[in-house]
């Protein structure tokens, strides 16, 4: 029986070696799988960290650019407001100057017209008196004193203009 046990022992020996070898290979595979898992996890964490950092940088960049755009817009709006205010002031001043000029022109026109009207009134008055005297003389209604005083006065336009 000893030989049967030897045979059985010898038959079990390769089986044990195979099991041991399989166990070692399984352990090696487990170790490699765990190492690959750890490395993948580490890479994923690193990628996540880089993504978060990139997002923060991008957010900061976008925020900075948005702030710059906002500042530029405010500056442009302020400049437009100031320019409009200046244009309005210039328009007010020009309108005031034009109003003053129109007033001066109206006063000068009134004075000139008043002078012409006064001159024309004097001419009409003189002609009316001359016509009255002529009619009186024609009908013999003028007295002796009036006939001597009456002289025909002729007023011409050129003399009226020079007055």
Curated annotation (Swiss-Prot):
Residues 32-115 are annotated as: 6 X 11 AA approximate repeats. Transmembrane segments: none annotated. Residues 1-117, 139-163 are annotated as: Disordered. Residues 152-163 have a biased composition (Low complexity). Gene3D superfamilies: Apolipoprotein. It comes from the Eukaryota. GO terms for cellular component: nucleus. Residues 28-56, 67-84, 91-113 have a biased composition (Basic and acidic residues). Keywords: Repeat. Sequence repeats lie at residues 32-42, 43-53, 65-75, 76-86, 87-97, 103-115. Belongs to the LEA type 4 family. This is Late embryogenesis abundant protein Dc3. It comes from Daucus carota.
């Amino acid at each position: 029986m000893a030989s049967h046990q030897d045979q059985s022992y010898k038959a079990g020996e390769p089986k044990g070696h195979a099991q041991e070898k399989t166990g070692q290979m399984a352990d090696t595979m487990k170790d490699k799988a765990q190492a690959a898992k750890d490395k993948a996890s580490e890479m994923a964490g690193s990628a996540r960290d880089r993504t978060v950092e990139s997002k923060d940088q991008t957010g900061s960049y976008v925020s900075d650019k948005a702030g710059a755009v906002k500042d530029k817009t405010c500056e442009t709006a302020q400049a437009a407001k100031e320019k409009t205010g200046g244009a309005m002031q210039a328009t007010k001043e020009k309108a005031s100057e034009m109003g003053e000029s129109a007033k001066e022109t109206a006063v000068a026109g009134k004075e000139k017209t008043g002078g012409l009207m006064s001159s024309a009134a004097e001419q009409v008055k003189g002609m009316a008196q001359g016509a009255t005297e002529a009619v009186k003389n024609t009908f013999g209604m003028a007295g002796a004193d009036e006939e001597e005083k009456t002289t025909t006065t002729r007023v011409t336009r050129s003399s009226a203009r020079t007055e």
